Regions:
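Extracellular/luminal regions of secreted and cell-surface proteins that mediate adhesion/ECM remodeling
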Residues: 1-254
């Protein structure tokens, strides 16, 4: 089909969160210089990358929300769902809507040798959920200490890196029902390093256990593939870990 494809793109600002349910970003629509809440996009052929000409305005003084959610549609209708009642509903929505994208990333410049960030964490469900967290450090000096902590979820883990790329994983028996809080991510450079290397990176990924009866089970991985034996034993062997969200930080020279 060579008929030009047209549509619209809406962009929303959000705080850092491992569960990007719509209430985190619904009321923070970005606008163009003309005040429109969407931009027109077009592609020459069906399936091509659509390109918009008009920019959105990102005002750093108006909000401290720098994570973004984008939704592309074939018309100008705003299609933001209500908050999801389960993790499963959220994951299915993401997988079934290729026009949805999330950018949960901070870019910072700092002269401090220690770093700390609070990443939002929610459990929308009426029951506690088994989950796993993965903190990956990339391009960091050997000897950097990285860690993650969330007391209500009984998450407490840290490691001293032995290579420039290292992943710290930990499973928790229960993220409490309707929990609405934070995971503390932290890192400390070794004494020999005066500053963070350019493009050093910390990424926190969050996976939740899904039963075979849940639709998102098909996109999961077996806990044994990513966790040590002791942590993997917390999970039912028929269940799968399904990625729900991630948050990242990139260090840049100030």
């Amino acid at each position: 089909d060579s008929t030009p494809q047209e549509g619209s793109l809406r962009l929303y600002r959000a705080g850092v969160s491992l569960f990007m349910t719509p209430s985190v970003w619904r009321g923070n629509a970005m606008k163009t210089p003309a005040g429109d809440p969407y931009v027109k996009v077009s592609a020459i052929n069906k399936g091509d990358v659509a390109v918009g000409v008009t920019p959105f305005v990102l005002d750093a003084t108006a909000s401290n929300r720098f994570c973004l959610v984008g939704i592309a549609n074939t018309d100008r209708t705003e299609t933001v769902p209500e908050d999801f009642r389960t993790y499963d509903e959220f994951v299915v929505w993401i997988h079934q809507n290729p026009g949805v994208c999330v950018r949960n990333l901070n870019v910072i410049g700092t002269t401090k040798t220690n770093y700390e960030q609070l990443d939002g964490l929610k459990n929308p469900e009426d029951k506690p959920r088994h989950a796993a967290f993965y903190l990956t450090a990339t391009n960091v000096p050997v000897g950097t200490t990285i860690g993650m902590q969330c007391e209500p979820a009984k998450l407490e883990a840290s490691v001293v890196t032995s290579s420039e790329t290292e992943t710290l994983s930990a499973a928790v028996p229960a993220v409490p029902p309707h929990f609405d809080g934070f995971v503390r991510v932290w890192a400390v450079l070794p004494p020999s390093e005066p500053s963070w290397p350019d493009d050093a990176r910390l990424d926190l990924d969050y996976g939740v256990e899904m039963a075979p009866s849940m639709q998102s089970h098909q996109w999961g991985i077996h806990p044994r593939e990513v966790l040590c034996a002791a942590d993997a034993s917390l999970f039912n062997s028929a269940f799968r870990l399904v990625m729900v969200g991630s948050c990242g930080t990139i260090f840049k020279s100030a």
